[in-house]
Design a protein with these regions (language model features):
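Generic structural signal for well-ordered alpha-helical scaffold segments
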Residues: 8-11, 107
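Structural beta-sheet core signal
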Residues: 20-23
Length: 112
């Protein structure tokens, strides 16, 4: 609830559409991350899926735009397709190959 309440406190100086960009799918063994992390790729993705469902519900209740490419980033088995993750060492950020997914969602929500 603090996540949404913080967004609701933002008072822009001009009218804007507030949007939440949901967390993305987790790093994969194909692009390993050496920072702190818990569980397998599937466990992390399942947790993110649950969080995103709660976040989407809260966005709807508060008239916020919810944008997610999470499901689009997954393989059929629920693992992350590494093509959407960066190639510059961390594997936890989006790559340029994710841009068409993002642009499609932004257009669908009339943000661009």
């Amino acid at each position: 609830n603090r996540y949404i309440s913080t967004i609701m406190k933002v008072t822009p100086y001009r009218p804007i559409n507030k949007a939440i960009f949901a967390p993305i799918a987790s790093w994969t063994e194909e692009k390993p991350y050496d920072g702190p992390s818990f569980g397998t790729n599937l466990e992390r993705n399942n947790t993110t899926k649950i969080f995103n469902k709660h976040l989407e519900k809260a966005c709807i209740e508060n008239d916020l735009i919810f944008i997610s490419i999470f499901d689009d980033m997954l393989n059929e088995d629920g693992s992350t397709n590494p093509i959407y993750l960066d190639d510059f060492g961390t594997g936890i950020h989006l790559s340029q190959k994710s841009m068409p997914l993002i642009i499609k969602k932004l257009k669908a929500n009339k943000l661009i």
